[in-house]
Amino acid sequence: MKNVLKIVAWVLLGVIIVGFGFIFFLNKDLKSTTNLQVTPIDLSILEDGDYEGYYENGRFTNRVYVTIKDHKIFDIDFYKTVDFDLPEVREALIQAVLDKQNIDIDTISEATATSKAYLKSIEQALRP
């Protein structure tokens, strides 16, 4: 019985340590990404074509192709998404950028850091 309690205690301690590690991982880079400043882009100076951009910051790292046609954002394709990607957040953000034709949009509620990371990679792609 004593050995069973020791095993249970060690397993419980292991679960607690893994849990704290996971919480640390989730919060790492959160503040710096949430506080990013995203600057609007002047589409009138961009030629037609595909532009590649990225944002690198831990679990918020992502990569994107942005297609410009007739000085308008025609398509946005994230080929490397953030860790713990929520497709509905990404799609809503893409649609908002396509509708407004700018990255100066409100972030998606409850996904501010993810939204900012995606917007920053689009900005980086289109920044001359």
Positions of PLM-derived features:
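Intrinsically disordered terminal and processing segments
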Residues: 1-63, 67-128
